[in-house]
Curated annotation (Swiss-Prot):
The gene is NS. It comes from Influenza B virus (strain B/Ann Arbor/1/1966 [cold-adapted]). The lineage of its organism: Viruses, Riboviria, Orthornavirae, Negarnaviricota, Polyploviricotina. Homodimer. Interacts with and inhibits human G1P2 conjugation by UBE1L. Residues 1-103 are annotated as: G1P2-binding. This is Non-structural protein 1. It is found in: Host cytoplasm; Host nucleus.
Length: 281
């Protein structure tokens, strides 16, 4: 087990891979501490969750190639990563920052703050759908599409035609999938299109994507974050088409809203935006 933050020795193991993993684990710890102080915005929270998933996967793979005696958990690597940062930033592992004290849980086992184990920090507050602010729905000339008992090919073609006729600027697109007289899911998309000199239109930003179940309850909500900004012209239509195809797969019974929401969120690595109850449904 890694020692606490006052230890001066850094044991990063052989090779750059161990050093990199440990350093990124230290970055994750910093993100989590900032989050525990409620000082991390939503894009930052997204990056925290992505980094944690990436590290967990990478550590699992890397440990398979290491002897059992050298395998380390994410928490152990966090401790090493934090110590690496202290050396890199201050060139003195015992150096402190004036006016700053590490966060410490005040309990009987950790009453002495300088000697407490830095891994004892509160869990990151959970984010549920209602915690996320969204842009207003006011968009000029919103487009609504109702797909009634269409086969997949016709449904996708109708959506594609509507998307391609959007003007430059912000738009709102509402999609209702009605299969065998069952309104299974309603999807609201807000975004911004750019019109290029050659006449080509691309989606520059996906501001929001909401999915509602049969009772009108919001089951998935995506809002403007760094992850939802389209990086190149082709991405806009690719993202929309992949989402629309997901919604318009043929089903003989109502689509499970929660399952579909998870599918939508996974397009952006945003599964954590579902509350625990919604994720389990």
């Amino acid at each position: 087990m890694a020692d606490n933050m006052t230890t001066t020795q850094i044991e990063v193991g052989p090779g750059a891979t161990n050093a990199t993993i440990n350093f990124e684990a230290g970055i994750l710890e910093c993100y989590e501490r900032l989050s525990s102080q409620r000082a991390l915005d939503y894009p930052g929270q997204d990056r925290l969750n992505r980094l944690k998933r990436k590290l967990e996967s990478r550590i699992k793979t890397h440990n398979k190639s290491e002897p059992e005696s050298k395998r380390m958990s994410l928490e152990e690597r966090k401790a090493i990563g934090v110590k690496m940062m202290k050396v890199l930033l201050f060139m003195n592992p015992s150096a402190g920052i004036e006016g700053f004290e590490p966060y410490c849980m005040k309990n009987s086992s950790n009453s002495n703050c300088p000697n407490c184990n830095w891994t004892d920090y509160p869990p990151t507050p959970g984010k549920c759908l209602d915690d996320i602010e969204e842009e207003p729905e006011n968009v000029d000339d919103p487009t609504e599409i109702v797909l009634r008992d269409m086969n997949n090919k016709d449904a996708r073609q109708k959506i594609k035609e509507e998307v391609n006729t959007q003007k430059e600027g912000k738009f709102r697109l509402t999609i209702k999938r009605d299969i065998r007289n069952v309104l299974s899911l309603r999807v609201l998309v807000n975004g911004t299109f750019l019109k290029h000199p050659n006449g080509y239109k691309s989606l520059s930003t996906l501001h929001r994507l909401n999915a509602y179940d049969q009772s009108g309850r919001l089951v998935a909500k995506l809002v403007a974050t760094d992850d939802l900004t389209v990086e190149d012209e082709e991405d806009g239509h690719r993202i929309l088409n992949s989402l629309f195809e997901r919604f318009n797969e043929g089903h003989s019974k109502p689509i499970r809203a929660a399952e579909t929401a998870v599918g939508v969120l996974s397009q952006f690595g945003q599964e954590h935006r579902l509350s625990p109850e919604e994720g389990d449904n």
